[in-house]
């Protein structure tokens, strides 16, 4: 079970598994025939407001720590989507979370935060299972 992260314009590799675009916006002017992802879940991208803030569209760019806090907070409304992805990975599907070609630093990209949220969800599920087993 693996969760990888990439930009959407990085070459496809045989072990990418399910390639999931997690951007709020679809890449502009990209023909459908040139799409490099299997599914697009825009709800897992930053909100329009958060996207504008991190890129400084309405003033100075938002500091990373503030972006991280707000993105994680926003994703609490996407718990079901995160649980679905955690289940896919837990059952052996490799998942590649894909973001904008402009997002060159994975350490400062929401796709890495999302990977952490999925991994945390998997850990909680494993903990719940262990607790149930120890009760018997």
Name the predicted role of every residue range:
Residues 1-136:
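Residues lining hydrophobic/aromatic ligand-binding pockets adjacent to catalytic sites
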């Amino acid at each position: 079970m693996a969760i990888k992260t990439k930009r959407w314009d990085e070459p496809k590799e045989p072990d990418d598994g399910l390639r999931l675009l997690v951007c709020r916006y679809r890449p502009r002017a990209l023909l459908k025939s040139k799409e490099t992802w299997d599914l697009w879940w825009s709800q897992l991208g930053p909100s329009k407001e958060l996207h504008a803030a991190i890129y400084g569209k309405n003033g100075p760019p938002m500091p990373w720590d503030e972006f991280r806090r707000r993105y994680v907070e926003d994703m609490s409304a996407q718990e079901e989507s995160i649980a679905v992805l955690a289940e896919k990975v837990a059952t052996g599907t490799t998942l590649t979370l894909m973001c904008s070609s402009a997002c060159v630093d994975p350490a400062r990209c929401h796709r890495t935060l999302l990977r952490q949220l999925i991994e945390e969800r998997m850990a909680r599920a494993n903990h719940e299972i262990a607790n149930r087993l120890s009760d018997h």
